[in-house]
Amino acid sequence: MLNYLCLMVRNLKNIPLNGNFGEVMKKINVLYDATVVCNILKNNSARSGIFFVAYNVLLEFLKRDEFNIFLYADDGGKLEYIIKNYSEFSDCKIYKYSLFQDLCNYVFYKKIDSKLNKKHFFAKLFWHILTFFLKFLDKIQKKYFVKVKDIDVYFSPMKAVPKFVLNNKQIKKYIILHDAIPLINDYRQNANHEWYFDLIKSINCHDIYFANSISTKQDFIEYVPKINSENIIVIPLSTGKEYVKIGDIDYINQVKSKYGIPLDKKYIFSLCNLDPRKNLIFSIKNFLRFVEKNNLDNFIFVLGGACWKDFENILNENIENLGEKKDKILKIGYVDDEDMSALYSGAEMFLYPSLYEGFGIPVLEAMKCGLPVICSNTTSLPEVIGDCGIKINPYSDAEMLAAMEKMYFDRDFREECITKGIDRSKMFTWKKCVDVIQNKIIGDIWGAK
């Protein structure tokens, strides 16, 4: 009997009440846009910063007793596949807006399943034609016929709110803003950024936006005047739980061998999508100056990450033009999640002189793994690194060279950066991130009742 009473008391603690004593507030029904989470099926640049934010925020949402989470994606078949094949999502519910959607999702799921199992070419072609037709009908249906019921909140970690939700004034909308890069660099003609400019068009003064840094918030206030600055709330991002400092040299060497990194070489590490704003040619040039000036023949520069197709030829051409020195530059491509910590932990330092960041997750990853960081003093990066590394002007060769020499030769300073970086990285957690989001949603929904 006593155990039963204790259980009742414990459960009552988790039941939210409003201002009237004893009146239980019902759970908030959240429709979560998991479109980008579906990139879990890919191993390329599609699984980069925004994907990991959407993925980890969703996992944290699913832990919260205050919410009923329903998933939505542009391609419901991918959601069906993920829920059936990824254990972390096995209890998730897909929001059903019509019987026709069930048919679409089943067909889309079968197409994915057939692709992943490498079935016959003509079978793939059949599924491709069928899904193209059904996607068209599904798009028409969502645009003109769907009425969303029993949803309190629509949460998007990336994309614009779809029209079938947008016109429902009863649903409160919340969107994460990641950066203003396409606005600043004017990517309007780039088809890959069509989703981004759809988002910009949809921004208004009523919905709530979560910015991943103070820098991102300020950029949206500057470049999107119609946004209400009071409706932008800054949230701290984090990394995957697998990012830790690894001391097992044998394991580190095993991972290095997997990516073709010579075991007898020290290496400086850079991990990012290989695109122009990451300032990689600047990094390569100054790395070579560093090793030549200091006669460090046993050093190489390891570049990890998927490459933009438009930039790949430019980067490769610059590396080829190095002549004999090109052997000091090693591109290892996309790095599997489980290998990240070992590669960070095995390096001498991390270079990230990016010209623009919305947040800068790789810097935080390096800090968590005990790797000292040299990064830009621009945009959001000072918010992440604090005083735990060296911040430089990303256009200054002199500052970059001096920073590399300081980090490598001053071992006391290096150890101080490692210790401070690990401590500071503990400030950034997905729990803190979603706590901010949850408090705002609960205040808006329950506070209005």
Language model segments and positions:
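Carbohydrate transferase catalytic cores enriched for Leloir-type hexosyltransferases
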Residues: 3-5, 10-12, 18-449
